[in-house]
Structures are given as C-alpha cells and as structure tokens.
C-alpha cells in the first residue's frame, strides 16, 4: 500500500510540475517561437474558415465543417493562451518609470489586447478579415517588442 501511495504522490508531483512549467521563469521558451506559433495558429484558422464557407451542402460535408469549426476554435484558444499565459504574464513588463518606457509598455499591452480580441472574433465568425487583422496586430506587437536582431531571427524561422 505504501508503494502505491508513493507512486501516486510522485505522479501527482510530476504532473503538477509539468503543468506549472510555463508559469515559472525557466528561460526554456523562446519569444520568436511563440510568435511563429501564433502565426501558424492564425493560418490554420484561416484555412478552417475557408473550408467552412465553401462546404455546407450535405451531411458528410456538415460533419467535416463541424470538425473544422472545432479546429478553428482550438487554434484561436491556443493563440489566447500564448498571449495571456506567456507574453502578458511573463514577458511584458514596465522597465522603469520613464515616459518612454510607459508608452512602450502601453503600446505592447494594446497590441496584445488586439490580438486577443481578434482571436475571439475568429472563434465567433468565419470572417477571414479577422485573421488578417490578427496577423496585422501580431506584426504591430513584433515591431514594438523585438529589436532588429529578434526580427531577423523571426524572418529566419520562415
């Protein structure tokens, strides 16, 4: 019985640690990769929207449409998770009390808020303009957040 209690406790601790991993400042994650993930999720949402709009006739297609809707929703949620759990809670910080620092901080927050809103709109509709707006707002954030070296690294990931 003690052995099973030990195993259960060990598994509980391990899974808790794995789940909490993204909430600690470990330095494992890469900012540029998070941006690329958001771009990839957005393009998947766009693909889902296009499929949904063009395939709504018979039951077989309706089944596929349902699957694409679920796909679109999941990718939009992933974008919201990356923005809120990674950038907003861990990366975006007020550097100092200067006006320049405060202005940059507010601009970054606004850009990420717009990405969150666009992801929400992608969940609510199949209007592909929302994916365009999402990518535009993401690009605005990239320009505010990354220095020239970071932007170069992003381009190399394409």
Regions found by a protein language model. Give the residues of each.
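Bacterial N-terminal signal peptides
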Residues: 5-15
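Sec/Tat signal peptide C-region and signal peptidase I cleavage site
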Residues: 16-20
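Immediate post-signal-peptide N-terminus of mature secreted/exported proteins
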Residues: 21-60, 67
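Amphipathic, well-ordered alpha-helical segments in soluble domains
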Residues: 41-51, 79-82, 111-114, 118
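Alpha-helical segments in soluble extracytoplasmic regions
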Residues: 49-90
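Short, charged, amphipathic alpha-helical segments
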Residues: 63-70, 102, 106, 129-137
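Long, amphipathic, charge-rich alpha-helical segments that form helical bundles/coiled-coils
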Residues: 82, 86-123
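C-terminal amphipathic alpha-helix
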Residues: 112-158
């Amino acid at each position: 019985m003690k052995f099973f209690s030990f195993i259960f406790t060990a598994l509980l601790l391990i899974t808790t640690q794995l789940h909490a991993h993204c909430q600690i400042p470990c330095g494992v994650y890469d900012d540029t990769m998070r941006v690329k993930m958001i771009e990839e999720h957005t393009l998947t949402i766009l693909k889902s929207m296009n499929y949904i709009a063009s395939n709504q006739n018979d039951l077989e297609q309706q089944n596929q449409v349902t699957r694409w809707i679920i796909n679109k929703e999941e990718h939009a949620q992933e974008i919201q998770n990356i923005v809120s759990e990674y950038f907003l809670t861990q990366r975006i910080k007020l550097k100092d009390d200067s006006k320049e620092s405060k202005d940059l901080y507010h601009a970054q927050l606004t850009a990420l808020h717009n990405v969150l809103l666009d992801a929400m709109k992608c969940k609510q509709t199949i209007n592909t303009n929302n994916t365009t707006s999402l990518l535009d707002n993401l690009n605005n954030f990239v320009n505010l957040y990354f220095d020239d070296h970071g932007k170069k690294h992003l381009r190399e990931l394409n």
